[in-house]
């Protein structure tokens, strides 16, 4: 399957002309053979000092199929155990890569891609994506999810110039990784609802075409969950296609707004380990659990609006002491304060928000029910409850209360700080 990126780079009904940096996207068996051809005699032959960034697991998974490619590259194999996209990993790459690299090949999943695109951006060299698992939607984005100074941040980076997703590689990835990819897509229900609500309440820029792209990705996966979990190659290709569509949506907008909001803010909080210890869970697993928690909270808000028990109130910073207690103990308080300046809610009047409540309810009503979402996640083998990722119920309320502060992006979870819900 060849995806024509030019289809997404055109004037849009939102008033913008979306820019797409990726030149070629190939999702099929034998895709890495095409990559080798391009490096030998095609459009990539001009690069004479390529660097492969992979880890011990992804190298083992690709060594045989990519032997000819590895022979022509500097290959940097990072230890997969405990690997994170952070300053430590960046330093390892910088200390070991040759000075004259002119191309980076990211051979791996989300963490390897974040490290690679961050390095590519800093050193102003292009990079190529070789996904080894359909585990997330970050392969073609222009941002990197990095842990910097203890805080999970989305930082400007670069998109790959080409993607070579070889079905012979990613369809054989552990089922846990594939389930994480499904989880990442199922969570789009939440972030799309948040984007619609932010547009309704504040007039924030909104692109319907990009939303349609994310919804297409969701539909593609929902209809094939059973076959994907059974490792059917054609359906695994559809999952990879859906994940790349989601990444293209982010590339079109220039940030992660179409694919990340309240549900990812919850996972960022967990990643910071200020209310919990280290979690032995994949990113997608944490995202699906967070999405389910947020869905339950949003349905609670919608029910209160329907029953006339929810009304807008003026914004007051009621969390200052909790922020000091939670983030201060790890020296992150000033970073969190800086992230949240100026306060998003100070621009919203309670009178205007009150008028928006029915519209908010309608947007929430479009979301799947808790039962439907639980069934979808269960069918795909995804994590569903806090217990699945090593947390317990005591983490739920602080997670929902503190998560909005991890990223200055408007969500209903943040807006709920201006809602007075009675009768519970």
Where are these regions (language model features)?
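ATP/NTP phosphate-donor binding region
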Residues: 1-103
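Solvent-exposed alpha-helices and their adjacent loops that cap or buttress functional pockets
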Residues: 17-19, 44-45, 96-99, 120, ...
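A glycine/threonine-rich phosphate-anchoring loop and its flanking beta-alpha core
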Residues: 23, 122-220
């Amino acid at each position: 399957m060849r995806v024509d990126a030019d289809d997404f780079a055109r004037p849009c009904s939102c008033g913008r002309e979306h820019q797409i940096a990726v030149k070629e996207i190939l999702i099929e068996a034998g895709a890495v053979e095409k990559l080798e051809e391009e490096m030998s005699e095609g459009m990539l032959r001009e690069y004479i000092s390529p660097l492969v960034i992979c880890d011990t697991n992804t190298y083992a998974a690709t060594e045989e199929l990519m032997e000819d490619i590895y022979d022509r590259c500097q290959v940097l194999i990072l230890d997969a155990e405990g690997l994170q996209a952070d300053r430590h990993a960046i330093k390892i790459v910088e200390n070991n890569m040759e000075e004259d690299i002119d191309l980076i090949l990211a051979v791996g999943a989300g963490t390897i891609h974040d490290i690679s695109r961050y390095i590519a951006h800093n050193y102003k060299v292009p990079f190529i994506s070789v996904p080894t698992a359909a585990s997330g939607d970050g392969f073609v984005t222009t941002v990197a999810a990095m842990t910097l100074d203890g805080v999970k941040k989305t930082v400007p980076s670069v998109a790959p110039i080409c993607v070579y997703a070889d079905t012979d590689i990613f369809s054989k990835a552990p089922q846990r990784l594939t389930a994480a990819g499904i989880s990442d897509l199922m969570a789009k229900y939440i972030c799309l609802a948040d984007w619609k609500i932010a547009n309704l309440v504040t007039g924030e820029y909104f692109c319907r075409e990009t939303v349609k792209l994310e919804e297409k990705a969701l539909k593609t996966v929902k209809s094939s969950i059973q076959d994907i979990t059974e490792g059917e190659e054609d359906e695994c290709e559809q999952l990879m296609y859906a994940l790349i569509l989601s990444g293209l949506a982010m590339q079109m907008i220039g940030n992660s707004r179409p694919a990340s909001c309240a549900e990812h803010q919850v996972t960022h909080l967990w990643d910071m380990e200020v209310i919990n210890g280290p979690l032995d869970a994949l990113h997608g697993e944490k995202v699906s659990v967070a999405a389910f928690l947020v869905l339950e909270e949003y349905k609670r808000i919608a029910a209160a609006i329907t029953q006339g028990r929810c009304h807008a109130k003026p914004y007051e910073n009621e969390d200052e002491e909790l922020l000091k207690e939670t983030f201060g103990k790890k020296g992150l308080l000033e970073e969190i304060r800086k992230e949240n300046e100026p306060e998003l809610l100070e621009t919203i009047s309670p009178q205007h928000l009150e008028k928006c409540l029915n519209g908010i309810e309608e947007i929430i009503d479009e979301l799947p029910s808790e039962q439907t979402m639980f069934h979808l996640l269960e069918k795909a083998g995804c994590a569903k409850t806090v217990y699945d990722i090593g947390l317990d119920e005591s983490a739920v309320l602080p997670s929902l209360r503190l998560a909005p502060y991890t990223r200055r992006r408007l969500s209903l979870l943040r807006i709920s700080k201006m809602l007075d819900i009675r009768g519970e």
